[in-house]
Amino acid sequence: MNISNYLDAIAKPFQGIAPWILRLVLGTSFILHGYGKFPLPPERMVRMFESGGMPAPDVVASMVAIGEVAAGSAIILGGLLGAAGHLVTRLGGGAVVVIMTGAFYLAHSDWFITPKLFMSEQIFIFAL
């Protein structure tokens, strides 16, 4: 038995639950990060957006918090809804892409101009 077959045999019992573990961890992470920004509007984010000259910072900050909770919920609930769940999961994933692109651009833009990007977990967070 070669190593590939051996690893396949070890992983086989977990094939059914692996996507659920990923859904639960990623979805819960976004729900908690969004919930941590309540009550709306999140004052720290509003101040950061104001300092960057963003129009309507209180509205945008509130939309980010609600979007994080909604996206995390969609990622988790998408696994429960059968065929419709694929659409729900993709919509939640699309919201995550928009939110995280904005987060990297607005809050973590220094990550892209430093060697620290490749020497810590930041590159993996960006890849997510």
Predicted regions and their residues:
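Extended, low-polarity transmembrane helix blocks
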Residues: 1-39, 58-73, 77-128
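Membrane-interface interhelical connector segments
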Residues: 39-56
